[in-house]
Each structure stands twice: as C-alpha cells, then as structure tokens.
C-alpha cells in the first residue's frame, strides 16, 4: 500500500509528515524549514506558496493569509483578478505540501490524513475534505488536531494508562481535549473550544496598539494603508515571538508612511508586561473551554496526569502561566508544539495502512446534532462528545392533520432554539398518506462517520418510503465545482512544472555559456585550435537560440555545445596530463644525476695542517 502522508493544515503554518518504520518524521520544505507558512500569493500568472509568498506579502496585494478561518463559509477572496473559494486556496497549500513530500519520498502521493480543529463543524470538515480532493488527495481520514497530538505523544506509552489534557492554541483556533490512554486505545472523553481564538488575535492586539500610538503621535491612521498594515502584521508577529524569550522588544518600521513634512517612521518599544496587559482578555478566554472539557469528561483536575501544549501560540508566557494556574500542573514539554499534530496525522496514516498495530483511536463529535421541531425548538439526537462513528434514530410525527410532507431542518449546536444554532442542511420527505396529526411515524436517523461528517435519513414507517442525504451545507461545493477545481489545480501543477523546467533550462544554458567562454579563454594559444573553433561555433549558436527564447532550439543547441565543450575539455586534460608526466619524468632523471655525482667513490679526503 502506498504511503499515507499526515498533514496539519494550519491557519498560519502547515506541516507534513510521514511514517518511516515506526517513527513519524516531519518532511522539510524546499527551503529547509519544517513548517510552511499557510500563505498563497499570485504574481505574473504564477501561484507562489509558503515562505516565498509570505516574504512578498508586504508588496504584493494578491496575497492570501489565514484562509483556514474562512473554511466552511461562502466567503470568497479576491486575488489575481479572480475570486477563489477557501477550498481552492487551501488546496494550493495542500498541493505544495504534497509536492515536496513526493520529492522527499521519490514516489507519487495520493492519500493523506488531514487534521482539523476539534471544534470544526460539519461544514468546515467537509470543506477540508473538498480541499484535499481538489489538491489530488484522497483524504483517508479527518482527525481532530488535539487527538493527533495525543497520538504522537502517546504512541510509545501504550502500555501505561493515563488521562491527558491537550491544550491546542494555534494561529486561528483553540481546542481543549481530554483523552484516556491505555492498552493502545486513545479514547477522547470530551472536547471543547473556540474557533475564533488564536495567535492571529494576539497579533491583532499589538497591531491595534501600534496604530493607536502612531495616530496619537502623528495624526495618521495606519489601518487605512494596506501596505503599512501588512508591515505592521509582520512586525506584530515578530514582536509576539520575541516576547516569548525576552522581556522587551523594539519595533522599528522606517518610512511606514508620509506626512506633510515628509516620511514618517515607527519606532516603539513593547514590554512583555504591556503585551500581557493588551492580551489579558484573550488569555482569559482560554480558561472557559478547559473547564467545559473537564466538566463534560466528568473529571477533576487531580485526575489529569499530563497537560500537553500544542500550537505555536502556547509559547506565549502568559498562556503557559494560565495553563499552570488553571490545571495546577507543569505542562509536558516532550513534544514540539508546531510539529506534533502533523506527526500524529502520519501515525493515523500508519494505523490505516497497518504499519502501526494495536492502536485504536476513538474520537468524538464536538457539537450536538439534531433537528428543528414544532415551535422552533432544537431537538438533539446526538449529544456533543459522543464517540464516533455513531448512529442514532428517533421517531417523530406530523404537526397538522393530513400533512403531506415533512421538512427536516438539520442543525448543529448547543442552544435550545433552532434559530440560534448552525444549519447544516434541509430536505423533505414527501407523499405521506393523509392522516390525523400525530399518527404518521417518521423515523429520523443521524449517522456520523469516522471523519465527523454527517448523513441524515428520514423514513415513513407506514409506507417504508425514505429520503437520505449526506449533509452538504449551503456554503459547500457541488461535485461539478470540485471537479472543475481539480482540473484547474492539475493544470496549475502542470504549468508550474513546465515553468520550473523552463527556468532550469535557462539556468543550465547560462552556466554552459559561462563555463565554455572561460574554457575557450584559458586554452588560447595552447595548440588545439580545431576543438576551440568547434566549441566557439556551438557557443555562438546557443547564444542565438537563447536570444530567440525558443526552448526546443535552446535544448538542442545546449546538447551540441556540451558535446563540443567536452571534446575541448578532453584535449585540455590530455595536455595537462602529458605536461605533468613530462615534469615527473624530468624530476626523476634529475634526481638520478644528483645521486651519481655524490657517490662515495668520488669523495676525496683533504689534509688539514695546523699552523
């Protein structure tokens, strides 16, 4: 079975890992970094992903960041003169990760396990699966990020029983999961979270502070200047990271804007104490899901054996202190918070292929599922934190006499009224025989698969007629749209490969011209004019092809030049070798002459007379 890669598709950074033997290994990107910025930019028709895209974010308005926060919505982003869905942008990131994983493995990759925040709803999970499909990946499993982290942490601890709390604060989302580990079973007891809380929010607090201070001093609102705002974002992220290691950092942004008197610069120092003050409300928000998860799991703090920190934002000192204060435990630092989720996803891939044995993952649904009933009430069929996969049925009836059809309004959430919860979909069961209200028996069945994706069935028990749908939210993509996007992605991949081939050829041509010119110069007057003239003629031909830009002609002329340059190089080396041999021979003969002159037979004893 082919390798299944594990992907952590993050808000700010993503990572890809693969199982090698029994160990999960992070695959470094082409720049040598173990995580890749989740940034996509467009320039001159080219799609740029990762570090290169992030570097040009300041100057390139066609740059998309933090697309994960829009997953599962109908919101589109404008770039490159087009509108893209969040699934399409995410697919570009996935395609990039897939590409360098293939380069590392030396084989085609078609399958992946992709992680999502535990608190992602059905629409967001479906959008993630669609993004994988667009990128040419068969998504074998969608795994909750804290669960993946627990897998990576606990794989070598399957012989011991412990309860762990995973605190996952990423770039745009926050999750807390409580798991029980024992005998190779990873059982998620409860999960809670906040999909609108992450490192980006901490950055925004710094940005707002800098904008306010600059406006106070200079009367100019930098938040209205797109380029200045991007520079502020970069500076805020850097300052946040700096303050994890030092107590004060300097923010310096020369020529940030211009005033009536000329250019203006932003120079400001930010202390950790001030940063903690600015972000106090965000840190406080992390405490509620911790308490909620413990309550849902029916556990007290004393029953938690380990606290695992996941996500780059858990490096913020105030966050670490809040975790300590809330749990009464020193967090376990045995895992890398940026890499552990992708590593866990790769382990789950190993479980699917059979390379990892005796490991069972029991995940849960993060939110309750149900339907709207009379009076706009939300009637739950599956409670949150139910182990998945699962199925649950309940019988309902009609609300009016002779009602010919029932509308099934499928919802996800925790509020008592339907209007306050997330609509997943609607469908209708028709042709119900005329009968007084309360008589028809309509059985509604909810199924949640291992990926947390929902399907619903309604069946008239009298006629046995049923209607069945896999939930696709109003914000989801149709199969036709996914198919079109897959073709676009494939075309882009082919175009990217062709572009790379062109660049490689042009670089090769430049290198060949430089090397041949150098060789021709060095061999001037050395006696092999035939080879030099042939190389010069081939060089001139290649230069003409280079000017024309005809790639096929360049390739042919490059091969011809390489042949002539090689012949010239052979002559050079032959001459050098002959000269070296002659020198060595002359040296040997000289040594022999010296030896005969100094032989003992020619030594004459001298007489010495003392006066």
Curated annotation (Swiss-Prot):
Which spans does this entry mark as compositional bias, Low complexity?
A: 575-592
- CDD domains, sorted: ASKHA_NBD_HSP70_DnaK-like
Keywords per UniProt = ATP-binding, Chaperone, Nucleotide-binding, Phosphoprotein, Stress response
This entry's Gene Ontology molecular function terms read: ATP binding; ATP-dependent protein folding chaperone; unfolded protein binding
Q: Where is this region: Disordered?
A: 575-611
Which Pfam family is one of this chain's hits? HSP70
Induction entry: By stress conditions e.g. heat shock.
Q: Compositional bias (Acidic residues) at which positions?
A: 602-611
PTM annotation (Phosphothreonine): residues: 173
Q: Which InterPro entries match?
A: ATPase_NBD (IPR043129), Chaperone_DnaK (IPR012725), Heat_shock_70_CS (IPR018181), HSP70_C_sf (IPR029048), HSP70_peptide-bd_sf (IPR029047), Hsp_70_fam (IPR013126)
Domain of life of the native organism? Bacteria
Q: Which NCBIfam families match?
A: PRK00290.1, prok_dnaK
Q: Which family does it belong to?
A: Belongs to the heat shock protein 70 family.
Q: Record's HAMAP family?
A: DnaK (MF_00332)
Q: What does this protein do?
A: Acts as a chaperone.
This chain belongs to the protein called Chaperone protein DnaK
**Which species does this protein come from?**
Streptococcus equi subsp. zooepidemicus (strain H70)
């Amino acid at each position: 079975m082919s390798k299944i890669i594990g992907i952590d598709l993050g808000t700010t950074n993503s990572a890809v890992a693969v199982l090698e033997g029994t160990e999960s290994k992070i695959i470094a990107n082409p720049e040598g970094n173990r995580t890749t910025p989740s940034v996509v930019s467009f320039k001159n028709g080219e799609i740029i992903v990762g570090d290169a895209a992030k570097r040009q974010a300041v100057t390139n308005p066609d740059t998309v960041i933090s697309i994960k926060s829009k997953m599962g919505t109908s919101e589109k982003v404008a770039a490159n003169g087009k509108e893209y869905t969040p699934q399409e942008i995410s697919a570009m990131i996935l395609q990039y990760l897939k590409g360098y994983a293939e380069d590392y493995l030396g084989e085609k990759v078609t399958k992946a396990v992709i992680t999502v925040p535990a608190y992602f709803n059905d629409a967001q999970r479906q959008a993630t699966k669609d993004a994988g499909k667009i990128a040419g990946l068969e998504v074998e499993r969608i795994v909750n990020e804290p669960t993946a982290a627990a897998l990576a942490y606990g794989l070598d601890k399957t012989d011991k029983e412990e309860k762990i709390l995973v605190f996952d604060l990423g770039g745009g989302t926050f999750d807390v999961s409580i798991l029980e580990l024992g005998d190779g079973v990873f059982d998620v007891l409860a999960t809670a979270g906040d999909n609108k809380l992450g490192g980006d929010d901490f950055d925004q607090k710094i940005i707002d502070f800098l904008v306010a201070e600059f406006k106070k001093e200079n009367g100019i609102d930098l938040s209205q200047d797109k380029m200045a705002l991007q520079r502020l974002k970069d500076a805020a992220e850097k300052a946040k990271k700096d303050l994890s290691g030092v107590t004060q950092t300097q923010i310096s942004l020369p020529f940030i804007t211009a005033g009536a008197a000329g250019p203006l610069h932003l120079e400001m120092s930010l202390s950790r104490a001030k940063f903690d003050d600015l972000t106090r409300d965000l840190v406080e928000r992390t405490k509620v899901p911790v308490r909620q998860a413990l309550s849902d799991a029916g556990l007290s703090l004393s029953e938690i054996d380990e606290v695992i920190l996941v996500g780059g934002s858990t490096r913020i000192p105030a966050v670490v202190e809040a975790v300590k204060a809330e749990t009464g435990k020193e967090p376990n630092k045995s895992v890398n918070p940026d890499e552990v989720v992708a590593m866990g996803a790769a382990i789950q891939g190993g479980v699917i292929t059979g390379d990892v044995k005796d490991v069972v993952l029991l995940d849960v649904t993060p939110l309750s599922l149900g339907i709207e009933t009379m009076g706009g009430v939300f009637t739950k069929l599956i409670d949150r934190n139910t182990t998945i996969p699962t199925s649950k049925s309940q019988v309902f009836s009609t609300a009016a006499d002779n009602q010919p059809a029932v509308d099934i309004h499928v919802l996800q959430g925790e509020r008592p009224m339907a209007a306050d919860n997330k609509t997943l979909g609607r469908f209708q069961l028709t042709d119900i025989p005329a009968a007084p209200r309360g008589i028809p028996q309509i059985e509604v069945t909810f199924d949640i698969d291992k990926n947390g994706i929902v399907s619903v069935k309604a069946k008239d028990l009298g006629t046995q007629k049923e209607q069945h749908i896999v939930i696709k939210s109003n914000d989801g993509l149709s199969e036709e749209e996914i198919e079109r996007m897959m073709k676009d992605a494939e075309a882009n991949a082919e175009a990217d490969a062709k572009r790379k081939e062109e660049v490689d050829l042009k670089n090769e041509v430049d290198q060949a011209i430089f090397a041949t010119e150098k060789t021709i110069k060095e061999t001037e007057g050395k006696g092999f004019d035939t080879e030099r003239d042939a190389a010069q003629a081939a060089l001139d031909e290649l230069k003409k092809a280079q000017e024309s830009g005809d790639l096929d002609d360049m390739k042919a002329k490059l091969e011809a030049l390489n042949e002539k340059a090689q012949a010239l190089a052979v002559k050079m080396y032959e001459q050098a070798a002959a000269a070296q041999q002659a020198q060595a021979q002359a040296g040997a003969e000289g040594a022999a002459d010296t030896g005969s002159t100094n032989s003992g037979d020619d030594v004459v004893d001298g007489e010495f007379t003392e006066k």
